[in-house]
Amino acid sequence: MKQTERPKKWQCVLTCWGTKYSSTDINKLITKIAENNHHVARFVVISDRVHKDLDPRAEPVGLPDIFNKPEFTTGGQCHAKLSMFQSGLLKADMPAIYIDLDTAILGPIEQAFDFRKDEKSIVMFQSAVLPFSAFARLLFRLTKGKRYARGNSSFVVFHPKYWTEIADKFLAIYEAGEFCKFRPTISDERYISWVAQDDMVALPNSFAVKFPTEYMQH
């Protein structure tokens, strides 16, 4: 596989809604990421509230009202995460790594950029038997999108300038009354994988982060 050059600068994206996580939790993760990664130039925290005592390295961004809905943020749903793909929410001047707040950092996560095929690649862990591959892409086309390889959205490598369609299409589906009726929208990671199937790349499970077991069993 041809790989792209690792970026000299990248942005780390975190999301937070509800009351489970505090500024302390966010700050600990920011510190750990900064300690282990030499090229992280920006931390963006997308949240439904203002966090007091937030690490000064963090740029707070409000969760857009259109994504701040109970059906996107409660009952185990994380569709609010898709807001990071909305046009203008993130600066499009550098690639990004999104990471869940309950992730333990075991090393330099910026190495994940090495797995990209090109700048448009979205890199995630596999979460299903069907791997991201030429076969999966063929199956996706032959079944008109009914069969596709899926990733785990606890860790996502992407470039904001290429993927505003993820948010745009999702909101169009929601406004058409097809949310959760259209099967790929039953979870944010299924939906990302469905939209970006042709550009999905898998991270090896040995990569230097650790998630709670339940996140890897979707």
Where are these regions (language model features)?
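N-terminal anchoring/stem segment of glycosyltransferases
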Residues: 1-72, 89-92
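Extracellular/periplasmic catalytic domains that process cell-envelope and extracellular macromolecules
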Residues: 6, 116, 148-150
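Residues that flank catalytic or metal-binding motifs in active/ligand-binding sites
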Residues: 8, 39, 81, 99, ...
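Short, hydrophobic beta-strand segments that form beta-sheet elements in well-ordered domains
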Residues: 39-48, 95-97, 123-124, 202-203
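Short, polar loop motifs at secondary-structure junctions
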Residues: 45-52, 107-108, 128, 207-208
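GT-A fold catalytic core of metal-dependent nucleotide-sugar glycosyltransferases
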Residues: 60-62, 80-132
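Short, P/G- and charge-enriched loop/turn segments at secondary-structure junctions
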Residues: 71-73, 139-146
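Catalytic core and acceptor-binding pocket of nucleotide-sugar-dependent glycosyltransferases
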Residues: 148-218
